A protein has these predicted regions:
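Soluble "head" domains of membrane/secretory-pathway proteins
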Residues: 1-174
Length: 174
């Protein structure tokens, strides 16, 4: 991880004092988990401050522009359940966001997201509107980012716990 890629920060407050590079769409970053800042998370930044993000029927749109995806094939995906193992075949897509191209894994039979695990504070924020388990739209507030995992149907990310504050950014993953 490069702690200085996005700037030199003041310790403890974690405010940038000497900016270096800006966080870009598609960057993979390490950050302090907003619900427990002693835990580090690594996710892909898909939306920047001021962006409007829509995720509908597993299709990502940023500022009314669809994020390009092309099929790449299937990979084996195994998920443990209380009843044993279930073997499912995800669709592997190649997504292009900003200057980054990367694989995204989706399970065709899984919902777009699971509203029952969206944290109450996220549901109360006026920044996001949810439509059952098929779609949501969010306006990213100033000083925050929207992060998603590449394993889209099995990722604990901004869909569930909200935006990543800039002060929580630790650095860029290599």
């Amino acid at each position: 991880m490069n702690k200085f890629n996005y700037g030199i920060r003041i310790p403890i407050a974690n405010n940038v004092v000497i900016p270096v590079n800006k966080i870009g769409r598609g960057d993979v970053v390490v950050f302090a988990y907003p619900e427990n800042e002693s835990v580090s998370f690594i996710k892909r930044i898909v939306a920047l401050p001021g962006d409007t993000i829509e995720y509908r029927d597993k299709k990502l749109t940023i500022n009314c522009q669809p994020v390009p995806k092309t099929p790449k094939g299937n990979d084996e995906y195994i998920e443990n359940t209380p009843m044993g193992q279930v073997n499912m075949q995800p669709i592997v897509l190649e997504e292009k966001l900003g200057v980054h191209t990367y694989p995204v894994y989706q399970l065709p039979q899984a919902p777009t997201f699971s509203p029952q695990v969206v944290r109450p504070k996220v549901l109360q924020e006026a920044a996001c509107q949810y439509e059952g388990n098929v779609a949501f739209t969010c306006k990213v507030p100033a000083g925050h980012y929207f992060a998603m995992g590449d394993n889209r149907d099995n990722s604990d990310d901004s869909r569930y716990w909200g935006f990543v504050p800039d002060k929580n950014i630790v650095g860029k993953a290599f």
